[in-house]
């Protein structure tokens, strides 16, 4: 059980919500603030004075006053008219994050929503009755309206859900969870719909995947150093301390740790080679820059996870209703775009190391890492696959946040495209997982070919993990299953956990 303290969520909590089947509870310390916010909205509605989102229309229709007897209908119509998402359903971890983030935002007491509505979301979450939310349809301002509308419609008994992974109607989902359809009161529909929780959930889910891939790439990159008989001198701490970037310093330390005790390295210490290619030698510089970006993005997303991104905001102490723009997801868009660049670079550098390993001139290994080349093609086309994926990622890494299209009759005339920025990270991460799987196979092949010299004790664990599923490549065979099984192990963090470097979300 994870207790959600609104405004004080942690990255480890969020990773567990995404990756484990933990249940959640709202911190009782938040109840008083929630109740004050709900009462403030009720008081404003009773007075009948115009207040955006409470008794007015929305967007370009904000100047339209809504009579008191139509306020509940206004909120219902808002939810139903905004549930216009298209595409495949959001993944289960993303929906779980989305619901937890929405509860945190609402729980700070500035949205004016009753506890009964929040309790219903908690009950659905813990019953594993998750709204079916189409992944496409948000521009990241005014919040993630369409995705959150699909979440909210379920509270009304409308739409679809997944009950323990099986698709069903929202009405059936409520029945299984022991709930009745809700009637939303003044502002509650808007409070549920307005916010950056969809884009932030997508970005967080992919952040955790990219953190795992980063750790895996440290292992695969170190293994490639030994496979290519590369030098460990470029990882000397003194080099990186002179430059001063924290990520570079930490990455170099990880490579030193992973390669410590390598007999392969000792075997060629006095060779004639002066410098290795950049894909080996500059790993701390490139991976360090990636590490800095990942850490920065994590910090931004944690702030957003704890933010109140509703509009308007209720300030119960003064009774004020303030309209602003916290729903604009530009910080999330920038963070996701930076993650895309970092993840694409992780894959691009790994692809270059694969190219180095299969090149006999550069690596000193048999061409394409196979004996009897000619009749056997070895890793020739596995590298082509890695190149295809790395190239695809370069296009996917184009920033989504540099685009904007006006909506709502030009009332909402600049948007963030944060949801797309976060969504395309899924494809980038999947491509990187496959590139790293190919590198791990190629590097393991190269290390085998360095026998009788052995790699380091740390990297021998990686070798054992690979060889538990895939044998040494002696002769050409149907290769795709080898890549698939190692990619699955990459996703399962089998290699990430071998890295000495870890992230805040894993603490």
UniProtKB/Swiss-Prot annotation:
GO molecular function, one term: histidine ammonia-lyase activity
Cross-linked residues, 5-imidazolinone (Ala-Gly): 141-143
GO cellular component entries: cytoplasm
GO biological process, alphabetically ordered: L-histidine catabolic process to glutamate and formamide; L-histidine catabolic process to glutamate and formate
Location(s) in or outside the cell: Cytoplasm
Post-translational modification: Contains an active site 4-methylidene-imidazol-5-one (MIO), which is formed autocatalytically by cyclization and dehydration of residues Ala-Ser-Gly.
Enzyme class at the top of the EC tree: lyase
EC id: 4.3.1.3
Reactions this protein catalyses: L-histidine = trans-urocanate + NH4(+)
PTM annotation (2,3-didehydroalanine (Ser)): residues: 142
CDD domains in UniProt: PAL-HAL
Gene3D superfamilies the UniProt entry points to: Fumarase/aspartase (Central domain) (1.20.200.10), Fumarase/aspartase (N-terminal domain) (1.10.275.10)
Pathway: Amino-acid degradation; L-histidine degradation into L-glutamate; N-formimidoyl-L-glutamate from L-histidine: step 1/3
Protein origin, superkingdom: Bacteria
Record keywords: Cytoplasm, Histidine metabolism, Lyase
Coarse class of the protein's main subcellular location: cytoplasm
NCBIfam families found in the cross-reference section: hutH, PRK09367.1
Family to which the UniProt record says this protein belongs: Belongs to the PAL/histidase family.
This protein's name: Histidine ammonia-lyase
């Amino acid at each position: 059980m994870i207790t959600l303290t609104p405004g004080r969520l942690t990255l480890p909590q969020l990773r567990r919500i995404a990756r484990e089947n933990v249940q959640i509870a709202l911190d009782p310390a938040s109840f008083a603030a929630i109740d004050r916010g709900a009462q403030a909205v009720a008081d404003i509605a009773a007075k009948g004075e115009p207040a955006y989102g409470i008794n007015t229309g929305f967007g370009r229709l904000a100047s339209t006053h809504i009579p008191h007897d139509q306020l509940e209908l206004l909120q219902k119509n808002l939810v139903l008219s905004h549930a216009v998402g298209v595409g495949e359903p959001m993944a289960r971890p993303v929906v779980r994050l989305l619901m937890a983030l929405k509860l945190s935002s609402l729980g700070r007491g500035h949205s004016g929503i009753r506890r009964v509505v929040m309790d219903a979301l908690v009950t659905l979450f813990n019953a594993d009755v998750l709204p079916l939310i189409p992944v496409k349809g948000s521009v990241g301002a005014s919040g993630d309206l369409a995705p959150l509308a699909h979440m909210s419609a379920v509270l009304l008994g409308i739409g679809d859900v997944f009950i323990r992974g099986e698709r069903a109607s929202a009405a059936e989902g409520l029945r299984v969870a022991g709930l009745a359809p809700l009637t939303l009161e003044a502002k509650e529909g808007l409070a549920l719909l307005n916010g950056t929780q969809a884009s932030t959930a997508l970005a967080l889910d992919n952040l955790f995947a990219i953190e795992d891939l980063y750790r895996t790439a440290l292992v695969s990159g170190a293994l490639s150093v030994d496979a290519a008989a590369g030098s460990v001198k470029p990882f000397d701490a003194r080099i990186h301390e002179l430059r001063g970037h924290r990520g570079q310093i930490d990455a170099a330390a990880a490579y030193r740790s992973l390669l410590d005790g390598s007999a392969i390295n000792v075997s060629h210490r006095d060779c004639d080679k002066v410098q290795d290619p950049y894909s080996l030698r500059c790993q701390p510089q490139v991976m360090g820059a990636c590490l800095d970006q990942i850490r920065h993005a994590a910090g931004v997303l944690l702030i957003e996870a704890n933010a109140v991104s509703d509009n308007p905001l209720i300030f119960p102490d003064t009774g004020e209703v303030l309209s602003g723009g916290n729903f604009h997801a530009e910080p999330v868009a920038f963070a996701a775009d930076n993650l895309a660049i970092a993840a694409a670079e992780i894959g691009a550098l790994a692809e270059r190391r694969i190219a180095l390993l299969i090149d006999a001139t550069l690596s000193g290994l048999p061409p394409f890492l196979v004996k009897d080349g000619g009749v056997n093609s070895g890793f020739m086309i596995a590298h082509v696959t890695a190149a295809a994926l790395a190239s695809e990622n370069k296009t996917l890494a184009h920033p989504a946040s540099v685009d904007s299209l006006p909506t709502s009759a030009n009332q909402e005339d600049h948007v963030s495209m944060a949801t797309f920025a976060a969504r395309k990270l899924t494809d980038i991460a999947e491509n990187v997982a496959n590139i790293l799987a190919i590198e791990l196979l190629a590097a393991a092949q190269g290390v085998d070919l360095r026998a009788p010299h052995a790699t380091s004790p740390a990297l021998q664990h990686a070798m054992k993990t690979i060889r538990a599923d895939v044998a040494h490549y002696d002769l050409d065979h149907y290769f795709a299953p080898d890549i698939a099984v190692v990619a699955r192990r990459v996703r399962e963090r089998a290699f990430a956990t071998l890295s000495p470097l870890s992230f805040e979300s894993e603490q």
